[in-house]
Swiss-Prot record:
Family listed: Belongs to the serine/threonine dehydratase family. DsdA subfamily.
Protein's recorded name: D-serine dehydratase
Gene: dsdA
Transmembrane regions listed in the UniProt entry: none
A Pfam family assignment: PALP
GO terms, biological process: D-serine catabolic process; isoleucine biosynthetic process
Superkingdom: Bacteria
Record-linked InterPro entries: D_Ser_am_lyase, Ser/Thr_Dehydratase, Ser/Thr_deHydtase_PyrdxlP-BS, TrpB-like_PALP, TrpB-like_PALP_sf
């Protein structure tokens, strides 16, 4: 961006200056509206989510066989929700803010197969593609027992096809592991910030890892180019895929069912706040969409990003979406939150979801490490840095009276609120890597 263009941007959107200075900010989204008004802009509906849920149910018997660790949940890839009462007290002291209601942790960090939120969308898109190919070839019918896909005959069939994806790490893990298990030839284009252990894990599953010295956007572009030039190659587009988005959106109904089992009420007097780490936007966007369908206007979805990679906040705040990247305003897009190191957010997700999101905030890298250390100390739960950006959310919301007043969230309602922090990854981090994370925490 030219200096004059940046100055014009600053004149119109003063918070851009705070972003450029890498400050931690909270921005309440004035475009936020009701589900009824916002839903038409998404281009998807409850029927699409139900279709995704049904597809995952069909694949449950296959997943049980292919990944025995899913047998305990009968082939359903789902995570538990846990209370973190000691951490809640610590957060109040840490931020000097009273947090009423209850903080819960959604442990997508410990999802089976790939240990992150990407096990939802990534694996779902691979399964969707596999189903389509097998149905077209007459090797599968929708009323079949899908465990038949776990056979040498089907592996040989899928081996004629390849899959490519660009990733900062976790999406590549989920797609690589699931694709290789089915028999696909799979290439994962990894950006410069991808962790070495994630590359090694993929290689151990027979995945072709292509390393790039530049950021996420380049990795995606190279993956797309490879798919265009190779016959029978399917590219999974993290920036624009509605299939990925729907895989994540199934989480909304699942959370609703879990809350019912836990006797947690969500209504006008019992608001639900969900804090979602955001990279390119597909994961949090899909989850937020599913939550909105499940809980309507009683759920308040808030995206959290690193100060060095606030791509979705920048895109939605300026209305430029994927026509601007953080590098345009001089931000380096280098962060310890490797899963969130995205300079240019998804234009599809930003435009689809901007009216259904309450707000956005940013967190510094050191603060992620500090929260990581506190959570380990208080609750014995270990996450990767990017999964901790959501942990700052309850204090940010509780301390923002303008936001609470605007949303008519009285002190009485906040006493009955549920704060759900979405832990996006970390369950498979090797011990030596985790030791380094913990050593970086200042607590």
């Amino acid at each position: 961006m030219k200096r004059t263009e940046i100055q014009q941007l600053l004149n119109e959107y003063p918070l851009v200056k705070n972003l450029m200075e890498l400050e931690e900010i909270f921005w309440f989204n004035p475009c936020n509206t009701t589900l009824k008004e916002g839903l038409p802009f998404v281009g998807l509906g409850a029927d699409d989510v139900e279709d995704a849920e049904a597809r995952l149910d069909r694949f449950a018997s296959y997943l049980c066989k292919a990944f025995p660790e899913t047998a305990v949940t009968h082939g359903i890839i789902e995570s538990e929700i846990v209370a973190i009462p000691t951490m809640q007290k610590t957060l109040e002291q840490h931020y000097g803010v009273g947090i009423t209601g209850r903080i819960l942790l959604k442990k997508d960090s410990h999802l089976p197969i790939s240990g992150s939120i990407k096990a939802r969308g990534g694996i779902y898109e691979v399964l969707t593609h596999a189903e389509k190919l097998a149905l077209q070839a007459g090797l599968l019918a929708e009323n079949d027992d899908y465990s038949k896909l776990f056979s040498e005959e089907l592996r040989r069939f899928f081996n004629q096809y390849s899959i490519a994806v660009g990733s900062t790490g976790n999406l590549g893990l989920s797609i690589g592991i699931a694709s290789a298990k089915l028999g696909f030839n799979v290439s994962v284009h990894m950006s410069a910030d991808a962790r070495e252990w994630k590359k090694q894990k993929l290689r151990s599953h027979g995945v072709n890892v292509v390393e790039h010295e530049l950021d996420y956007g380049v990795a995606v572009a190279r993956g797309r180019k490879e798919a265009e030039s190779a016959p029978n190659c399917f590219f999974i587009d993290d920036e624009n895929s509605q299939t990925l988005f729907l895989g994540y959106s199934v989480a909304g109904g699942r959370v609703k069912a879990q809350f019912e089992q836990m006797n947690i009420v969500v209504d006008e007097d019992h608001p639900l706040f969900v804090y979602l780490p955001c990279g390119v936007g597909g994961g949090p966007g899909g989850v937020a969409f599913g939550l909105k369908l499940a809980f309507g206007d009683h759920v308040h979805c808030i995206f959290a990003e690193p100060t060095h990679s606030p791509s979705m906040l920048l895109g939605v705040y300026t209305g430029l979406h994927d026509n601007i990247c953080v590098q345009d305003i001089g931000i380096d897009n280098i962060t310890a939150a490797d899963g969130l190191a995205v300079g240019r957010a998804s234009g599809f997700v930003g435009r689809a979801m901007e009216r259904l999101l309450d707000g956005f905030y940013t967190v510094q890298d050191q603060e992620m490490y500090n929260l990581l250390g506190l959570l380990d100390r208080d609750e014995g739960i270990r996450l990767e840095p990017s999964a901790l950006v959501g942990m700052a959310g309850p204090a940010r919301v509780s301390g923002n009276l303008d936001y609470l007043n605007n949303k008519n969230l009285s002190a009485e309602k906040m006493k009955q609120a549920t704060h759900l922090v979405w832990a996006t990854g970390g369950g498979m981090v090797p011990d030596d890597e985790m030791t380094k994370y913990l050593a970086t925490a200042k607590i």
